[in-house]
């Protein structure tokens, strides 16, 4: 399957124009390549249903949040009608191409929810996916794992492992997430894995001492890119780092550009009451650089360097 590459048009400038107009900055841009990032997000959308989306303000804000992401992993999609996500995509597709992939409804009781991937189908495709086989019933909502292409020669694909823990079993579920990672690697031999979601990994659900002792903290190669102490909650009365992103793999590390929460109430100038109609969580996101070394013919590069010399020596 071909991967989308940032396009670049190369043209040798007229020598006289080059001597007068070129400076070093354009050359550096050419050598470094594009700086566009590929953004992967996770968002606990707080009991997302079709009825919730019929509220115009909720729909408009959700569309703006989703449109920022190349892949979004939604949690707490609780609608069993199969109509919620297609309805949401109708609004999203007005300017770009989107597809989605969802799990079945998961949960031990009458309350169940889905994991849903919404992704830019013009930038990425699903290579494979599976529901983790939780034979020991450790997870309330076992991870729904997906393998995506990426528009990068350095990192052609990445595996996403979402998890929404149940607060009473946070430590047990997060330690079992290491077994999910091993299962992913055994299946696809891909070490570039991003584990993400509402881990409930803070405050009353998980003490700092227990957080430090987690397997994903003590095993080498796992990088928690949302800092401890970063508030991922909307309510002013809480300050908890519930939502997390954990990155593994050399390719992910090489291309890691940024990771952050997205304070959508601040961005969209919402009151706390208005924001809580959408969710009580902020989305969390990681950006992977798409920059790749440009293949510039050596004689073109030499000509460009020579053309710069007069302007630098004047």
Curated annotation (Swiss-Prot):
Root EC class: hydrolase
Entry keyword Ribonucleoprotein: no
Active-site residues (renumbered): 113, 164
An annotated GO cellular component: endoplasmic reticulum
Pfam families: Exo_endo_phos (PF03372)
Cystine pairings recorded for this chain: 203-240
Name of the protein in question: Deoxyribonuclease-1-like 1
Organism: Mus musculus
């Amino acid at each position: 399957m071909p991967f989308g590459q940032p396009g670049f048009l190369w043209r040798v400038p007229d020598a006289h124009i080059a001597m007068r107009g070129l400076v070093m900055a354009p050359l550096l841009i050419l050598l470094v390549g594009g700086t566009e990032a590929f953004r992967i997000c996770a968002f606990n959308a707080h009991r997302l249903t079709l009825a919730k989306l019929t509220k115009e303000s909720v729909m408009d804000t959700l569309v703006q949040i989703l449109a920022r992401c190349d892949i979004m992993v939604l949690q707490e999609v609780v609608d069993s009608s199969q109509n919620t996500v297609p309805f949401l995509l109708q609004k999203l597709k007005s300017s770009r191409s989107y597809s989605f992939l969802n799990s079945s409804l998961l949960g031990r009781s009458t309350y169940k929810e889905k994991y849903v991937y919404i992704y830019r189908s013009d930038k990425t495709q699903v290579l494979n996916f599976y529901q983790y086989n939780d034979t020991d019933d450790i997870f309330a909502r076992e991870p729904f794992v997906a393998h995506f292409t990426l528009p990068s020669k350095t990192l052609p694909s990445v595996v996403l492992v979402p998890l929404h823990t149940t607060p009473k079993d946070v430590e047990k579920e997060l330690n079992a997430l290491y077994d999910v990672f091993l299962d992913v690697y055994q299946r696809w031999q891909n070490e570039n894995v991003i584990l993400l979601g509402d881990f409930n990994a803070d405050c009353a659900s998980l003490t700092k001492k227990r957080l430090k002792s987690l397997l994903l903290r003590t095993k080498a190669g796992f990088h928690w890119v949302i800092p401890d102490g970063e508030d991922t909650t909307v309510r002013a009365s809480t300050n908890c780092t519930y939502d997390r992103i954990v990155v593994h793999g050399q390719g992910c590390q090489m291309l890691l550009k940024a990771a952050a929460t997205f304070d959508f109430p601040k961005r969209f100038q919402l009151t706390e009451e208005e924001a809580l109609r959408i969710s009580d969580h902020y989305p969390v996101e990681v950006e992977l650089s798409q920059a790749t070394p440009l293949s510039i013919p050596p004689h073109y590069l030499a000509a460009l360097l020579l053309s710069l010399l007069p302007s630098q020596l004047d």
